[in-house]
Amino acid sequence: MNEQLDMLVLMRPAPIRRPILADGDVVQGEPHETLRLPHPRRAWPMACIELHQHDGGMWMWGVQHAGGGYKVGPKWGRFAYTRYDALYFAADELIERAHRSLSRIDTQFLSAAQLRQVIAWAKGLE
């Protein structure tokens, strides 16, 4: 089964990256979909992925965790052909960011255990 899933990943088109637009827009209202990993004690989530369909039918994503990240919008130039692909790329980016945070000494917003929880959550979304 894993070999079959790996083949599906190989067939996925690469994300579409456009230059960042300094004066570009982000979604001001609610994005089409928001996935959150709740924090056990705080009001804000440990991790959040926003997905939104752009005017041309392509999907955009935004990723937040450990007090940082960005809101979904065309400003960031991150696009995918399908919602499924956008979710995959967002989860992959979140995993990469959480691994970078784990490698730093000061994880002031999330503990190492919480960062590992973020990684496991994002892997479950892929």
List the predicted regions and their residue ranges.
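Intrinsically disordered, low-complexity segments enriched in small/polar residues
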Residues: 22, 27, 54-55, 60, ...
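Compositionally biased amphipathic helical and low-complexity segments enriched in hydrophobic
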Residues: 6, 36-38, 52, 88, ...
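A short, exposed loop/beta-hairpin motif centered on an aromatic-Gly-Thr core
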Residues: 64-96, 100-101
